[in-house]
Amino acid sequence: MKVKVVQKEDFHFVGTGESGREVPIDAAGYVGGKGRGIRPPELLFHSIAGCVGIHLYEALHKEGKHTEHIEIETDAERITEGYPKVFTKIYLYVKVVVFIIGK
């Protein structure tokens, strides 16, 4: 999988992947970002939750279970002093509502 990220202005970047869709990316305001896109850590968590949701839907569907609702929330603990500001723990809270299709 290839993704290309190009700087547009100062902390503002735009990423494009194989799907051709553009993803605006910007830094947090405290380092000079101006709200022109998603902050990279937030984008990471969107990706994690999206992957979990898609794979969960696929697995349940293959087992004959119909999903009415899938919801994934993320949270994390992060070292905020110094650099890099690494995540030390990532939490996923998954809520699924399903019903089993009769045989």
Model-assigned labels for residue ranges:
Residues 51-52:
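Alpha-helical metal-binding/catalytic segments enriched in His/Glu/Asp
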Residues 1-46, 57-103:
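Extended beta-strand/beta-hairpin segments
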